[in-house]
């Protein structure tokens, strides 16, 4: 399973966010602009696919409905494009749906839904699910069939979800793969100190609810191959670290506590990871999340501001190491750091356009304008990312500049 892109609209302060996902991508904007809302919108869209009845009702209740005057009450739209393997052959898919939020006297419901697929040799997509209205859903019943068989499905349930739960249906194999997609929005804004707490600390969902220290110990004792990969990556990330050893201590009464012992260069003996710098702990935290996603074949993870607490000189190494070791897991992150931007390609960056309308508008630089921006950056002896950080401040309230240099969605 691979994810190639998302489109989201009509949630929080998001209007028409269209993201093409590379191995590593970043949403770049000032604080309070809406970067986190884009991640939450994607999380919401993926989560609704596999949500149970009570959770669907709660999600449709309108908590995330846009209250911006320009988009108030607008339906939520979600589209996900990617590739899945069917019978040994890779196929492209585009799955989308639209939800009407619950309002006074009206329950939330599915308004529209579509699933299209094609093989790499096909010119056109084949329609597999076509739900033009809440109560009007058509599906493909067989390999040779057309998308013309009526399919009854409750108003607040996606047809794809119903098919994934029905083992005997023709589309079950396709639907089950999309239904099972995980795109975790990881809590990387938190101080990593709590995740390494010897006394227990906070469990993390992608780590099976374990603390980081316990997960690292389980990895060491149960998955030697991935543990070796993790240690190799950490030694590259933190050159002063000479030894890395997750440990368990059994206490009277059967209780166990977990710790990670670190031996640093110039230190006479190992110490607990709690004594490591915040930046080093954060790099261990982020890299472990990437390894966990890799082990579970998670197609994409979302991270908030990975540069926090990390020295600017270490950011490039952190990005490269995370990207290389995550393998097929793509990374979508948020950032407001010019130091991080200097290590990204233009195709990896989505900039928040300062249109001052309360909505989050994210766009990429128009490829035809890159040569001019690179020249301007070179004249000032800046990297492209550094120049763009200042450029975004200059285009505020200048709609002509935004239209000239950015792809309009």
Task: Name the predicted role of every residue range.
Residues 21-63, 283-289, 337:
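Phosphate-binding glycine-rich loops of NTP-binding sites
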Residues 29, 305-310:
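ABC ATPase nucleotide-binding domain "signature" loop
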Residues 89-236:
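Electropositive, glycine-dotted interaction segments
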Residues 257-267, 272-303, 313-315:
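GG-anchored amphipathic helix commonly corresponding to the ABC/SMC/Rad50 NBD signature/C-loop
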Residues 316-409:
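C-terminal lobe/lid and adjacent interdomain/linker elements of RecA-like ASCE P-loop ATPase modules
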